[in-house]
Design a protein with these regions (language model features):
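Acidic, surface-exposed loops and disordered segments
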Residues: 1-131
């Protein structure tokens, strides 16, 4: 269900940045090496993507010019059922940012990761970047 409101707001149309309560990159990412600045900008665009109930289900493992993207496993299916939509929005944010930075990105599914069983996360895709 999608809800749209019409009319004029009583206060500001925008919430304050502190109210967004986004997780930091350090909470979302595991870095195998220090990432370059353009990689951090791309990850930040993904981090800022809206998600249902602010669930922010994405987790990233960053190595060289690769980002392995995982979905946080949910204790209940209530939030998990929206993950496809949430990830679609996050990928759109990431790809838009990559295009703005003139980066080539291939989204691929790696068999060696998709067949592994991870305790708290589920493998989704990998982003291979070519600056």
């Amino acid at each position: 269900m999608v809800v749209m409101a019409f009319g004029k707001p009583k206060g500001s149309c925008y919430r304050k940045q502190v109210e967004a309560k986004r997780l930091s990159l350090d909470e979302l990412c595991v870095y195998k090496e220090t990432p370059r600045q353009w990689m951090k900008q791309l990850l930040d665009a993904a981090r800022m993507a809206p998600s249902s109930m602010n669930s922010q289900p994405w987790r990233f493992v960053v190595f060289d010019s690769r980002i392995h993207i995982f979905s946080k496993k949910h204790p209940s299916d209530k939030l998990g059922k929206w993950d496809e939509v949430n990830f679609g929005i996050m990928f759109a944010n990431m790809m838009t940012a990559a295009e703005e930075m003139w980066l080539d990105v291939d989204l691929i599914r790696l068999d060696e990761l998709s067949q592994k069983n991870f305790q708290n996360n589920q493998y989704v895709l990998s982003a291979i970047l070519r600056p």
